[in-house]
Swiss-Prot record:
The gene is ansA. L-asparagine 2 binds at residues 162, 240, 271-273. It comes from the Bacteria. It comes from Escherichia coli (strain K12). Residues 4-329 form the Asparaginase/glutaminase domain. Belongs to the asparaginase 1 family. This is L-asparaginase 1. Pfam families: Asparaginase (PF00710), Asparaginase_C (PF17763). It is found in: Cytoplasm. InterPro entries: AsnA_fam, Asp/glu_Ase-like_sf, Asparaginase/glutaminase-like, Asparaginase/glutaminase_AS1, Asparaginase/glutaminase_AS2, Asparaginase_C, L-asparaginase_C, L-asparaginase_I. Shows cooperative activation. Allosterically activated by asparagine. Its main location: cytoplasm.
Amino acid sequence: MQKKSIYVAYTGGTIGMQRSEQGYIPVSGHLQRQLALMPEFHRPEMPDFTIHEYTPLMDSSDMTPEDWQHIAEDIKAHYDDYDGFVILHGTDTMAYTASALSFMLENLGKPVIVTGSQIPLAELRSDGQINLLNALYVAANYPINEVTLFFNNRLYRGNRTTKAHADGFDAFASPNLPPLLEAGIHIRRLNTPPAPHGEGELIVHPITPQPIGVVTIYPGISADVVRNFLRQPVKALILRSYGVGNAPQNKAFLQELQEASDRGIVVVNLTQCMSGKVNMGGYATGNALAHAGVIGGADMTVEATLTKLHYLLSQELDTETIRKAMSQNLRGELTPDD
């Protein structure tokens, strides 16, 4: 039986960094040298893999929509030559990149796993070894044909993840959807609902930078704060509200949202809570937002909502189509109402 072959896109991040007097820094070729010294990556059970190092290597804090586009085009260029793809990435914006790729890559017929580490691969107690080893093995032997994120022995749907711990190995959470797979003594696929999946050739949708605001509601927030966020050229606003989607019933505040909606700005309501979903019909305060033209974001993460808006705004769709699509389950990013 022919061995599977996995393409590794090494964008940067902690996993390949080297210690210096200024702290950890990315060094070209360092990751590859470390992997050559680790025999477990070259056991016969492991797939073949090719590492493509990006130039320059990036700290994920510098990641932009142009970089998401570059990664997606890289996957497209090598799509027919490999059985799966692993993206090595810094943890700070990993959930954003995984979410963005999920929307950009339509009709995905091969696994794309995003992973990295909290401690560099070359350092004692690095989590990079087990994360990368498992990502390669799972991509080859337990393929799930969507964009996923592997960290600390769990494989998550990428657009359901958020970074939940700044310095722990259990760095990522999927608050509203169980993992797709767990890698313990045995590797187990879980009965997690599948994402919607189309048929046909892989389509890579473009993403371009879009002016999107994010506002967290807090006690005493003024209409002026919201007004400043809604100034041109903003095309969309994510409103992080209380509980199931509640916000102050301040008339000036609601008027700003109504006027923004009338101007064609897409306003999406997300809960500040770690888990659960928005239901703007549950309380009068949430209902007032709906009457002001605000769309409910269901149980999407901020990362999924932001990248979904980037994706839709990049397609030159009219405002009403974008509003409808924000409430639709395109890539498994939200839980539809029963």
